[in-house]
A protein has these predicted regions:
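Alpha-helical transmembrane segments of multi-pass membrane proteins predominantly involved
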Residues: 1-219
Length: 219
């Protein structure tokens, strides 16, 4: 595979990963959020395989395997189970409505292009075209966290944010050392478990996973 073709494929893959994050903004179903995260992680795992093959870095194959096991199989399954247990099916009243959310997300991606333009122009890596998309994914993940009321949606936003960081690290360094990615996975799993306990406590106290209910604890 020549560098030109690889550059196009890496940019296409990054575009698909970013596209799945927009599902979190234009859909209300929590099940759709989990499915979008699962497919996003699967595409990201495929990108790790592609970069590992071209860069002759077998460690990236292990990273891809971890992505498939942890983020495509284990975490989405737990999220589906959590959704059924707490009875949360829809993000009915987000802080920011859907049309406005999509506009803001588009502006965040444009901001990412503006911020990363000097880096893209200075880089000689064939993966440089996907750098703005990775930064845009991080911005969108952050926006999901702050613009949605359901704790479960915010958990998915956090996971999407971590996918953006992984994508940025892979495209920006042309690969990630296995030990670094293992450390990141451990942090993500610990954060996910803590958030799961947090959601159970919110639901047990308020019979809802709307984080706005936490305002009742004031005073």
């Amino acid at each position: 595979m020549n560098d030109a073709l690889f550059a196009q494929l890496s940019t296409l893959g990054a575009s698909l990963v970013l596209l799945f994050s927009f599902v979190l903004l234009w859909r209300r179903s929590l099940h759709a959020y989990v499915s979008a995260f699962r497919w996003q992680s699967a595409v990201l795992a495929g990108m790790f395989v592609m970069v590992g093959d071209l860069g002759s870095d077998p460690e990236l194959y292990f990273v891809a395997a971890f992505f498939l096991v942890v983020k495509v199989m284990i975490i989405p399954r737990y999220l589906d189970r959590l959704e059924k247990r707490v009875g949360a099916e829809r993000e009915s009243q987000p802080y920011v409505n859907i049309p406005t959310s999509l506009i803001i997300a588009g502006l965040l991606v444009l901001l990412a292009y503006a911020i990363t333009r000097p880096l893209v122009l200075a880089s000689a890596l064939p993966t440089r075209g996907g750098l703005p998309l990775a930064v845009g994914l991080i911005f969108v993940g952050l926006f999901v966290i702050i613009s949605r009321k359901k704790a479960l949606t915010q958990v998915v936003g956090f996971l999407v944010l971590e996918n953006g960081i992984a994508l940025l690290a892979m495209l920006g360094t042309y690969g990630i050392p296995l030990i670094v990615e293992l450390g990141v996975f451990l942090d993500v799993l610990m954060g996910f478990l803590v958030m799961q306990v947090f959601i159970y406590h919110i639901h047990g106290t308020f019979e809802s996973i709307d984080v706005e209910q936490l305002n009742q604890l004031k005073g």
